Amino acid sequence: MTVTTSSPATAPGRTPGIGRVARVIGPVVDVEFAPDELPEIYQALQVDRTIGDETLTLTLEVAQHIGDNTVRAISMQQTDGLVRGAPVHDTGAPISVPVGDATKGHVFNVLGTPLDVKQIEAETYWPIHRSAPAFDQLESKTEMFTTGIKVIDLLAPYVRGGKIGLFGGAGVGKTVIIQEMIRRVAKEFGGVSVFAGVGERTREGNDLFLEMTEAGVIEDTALVFGQMDEPPGTRLRVALGALTMAEYFRDVQKQDVLLFIDNIFRFTQAGSEVSTLLGRMPSAVGYQPTLADEMGVLQERITSTRGHSITSLQAIYVPADDLTDPAPATTFTHLDATTVLDRAISDLGIYPAVSPLDSNSRILDARYLGQEHYDTAREVQRILQRYKDLQDIIAILGIDELSEEDKILVNRARRIQRFLSQPFFVAEQFTGIPGKFVPLDETIDSFKRLTQGDFDHLPEQAFFMCGGIEDAEKNAENL
């Protein structure tokens, strides 16, 4: 498939020049220009390559000026068939992607070319390299982003315009949470979502697109993919392309946007590959010396401006489970909240399988949430932590060997654990249980009364897969 794009704008005051390919080493291409026609850093270049009878257009991005009127560029596609001396056209602008309503419901590559249809009718294109909002444009107050998901709102609340790290292995419900968040932003808040597949397996991206189509959330979502088999330049820039689409929805259409990045580690990994290709001296553990800078350029654009926000949910792979590795360690400094999915919880059939003890948020504080919310959350965590501490004793000696106080606490903890489950709208077709949106006030009140023992008389099973506490009481009547 030909993946071509034309830059919609030319830098003012300069006529784009034509150069020629001087050297090709994998995805790195050196291009010579006339002295007065040298393109700027991040400028997009285009060159044709021929494979058999087919001619395809490559897009390159200028990365370095190396002297002798030569620039070093990184290709966004495979360079097979590219020859020395081939003419290279300076587009006069950075790589640009379509923005606006035309992007909803479609899948794009890093160049803004649609992958699910032949073309789209986009009126506006924005360059992927943009400045972060000015300091005086930022939203100064810290505000909670209510999801309607009990376990998240109570124990690891999200920040509007913040960055959330999503930790989860295969099969624990990460994709379902992503789909549910997309659906809730669209239906409950009238917002839009943008998904960036960075270093995704092609199969996973295809599955996500089909599942989102079946779940009915694709109409409010734009997807941008740079698959695992594509050159590092593509994987390094695809997150910026998705972020640019999200910025348009925030700044021009004045919408609240949810931005998903899966996986942020692949962004760092691609940057390391590009850095090596450009001949830079590596830093710790072989990562690029510009690691913190590249991460900051991406993360600082994800923020709230006056009244509108981009809230980011980022899947994070931790190499060898080493949290001190420079890649995840650099990401952690930007996160406002972490949501940890636990396989042990999913094995119990409790979904969402969010760990109430491992997940956290910087705004889980009485100053931001109020004293009642904070005290309720801490009491829930205290009870669940005590239950966890007693697990070994229960397994060896049995629950009858516990003190009366601990028996009450264990039974209460099991009710809380099951009440943290919740039916999702996007899973309704599989579970047969209607999805539930639980208001924050109801969540706090329900768990406060649970910790005080107001519902100790209800059977454990009544709390499983229900929304508010009224659902649990109805379930108890039907048991």
Curated annotation (Swiss-Prot):
The gene is atpD. Keywords: ATP synthesis, ATP-binding, Cell membrane, CF(1), Hydrogen ion transport, Ion transport, Membrane, Nucleotide-binding, Translocase, Transport. Its EC number is 7.1.2.2. It is an enzyme of class 7 (translocase). This is ATP synthase subunit beta. It comes from the Bacteria. It is a peripheral membrane protein. GO terms for molecular function: ATP binding; ATP hydrolysis activity; proton-transporting ATP synthase activity, rotational mechanism. It comes from Frankia casuarinae (strain DSM 45818 / CECT 9043 / HFP020203 / CcI3). F-type ATPases have 2 components, CF(1) - the catalytic core - and CF(0) - the membrane proton channel. CF(1) has five subunits: alpha(3), beta(3), gamma(1), delta(1), epsilon(1). CF(0) has three main subunits: a(1), b(2) and c(9-12). The alpha and beta chains form an alternating ring which encloses part of the gamma chain. CF(1) is attached to CF(0) by a central stalk formed by the gamma and epsilon chains, while a peripheral stalk is formed by the delta and b chains. Belongs to the ATPase alpha/beta chains family. It catalyses: ATP + H2O + 4 H(+)(in) = ADP + phosphate + 5 H(+)(out). HAMAP family: ATP_synth_beta_bact. GO terms for cellular component: plasma membrane; proton-transporting ATP synthase complex. It is found in: Cell membrane. ATP binds at G168, G169, A170, G171, V172, G173, K174, T175. InterPro entries: AAA+_ATPase (IPR003593), ATP-synt_VA_C (IPR055190), ATP_synth_F1_bsu (IPR005722), ATPase_alpha/beta_chains (IPR050053), ATPase_F1/V1/A1_a/bsu_N (IPR004100), ATPase_F1/V1/A1_a/bsu_N_sf (IPR036121), ATPase_F1/V1/A1_a/bsu_nucl-bd (IPR000194), ATPase_F1/V1_b/a_C (IPR024034). Produces ATP from ADP in the presence of a proton gradient across the membrane. The catalytic sites are hosted primarily by the beta subunits.
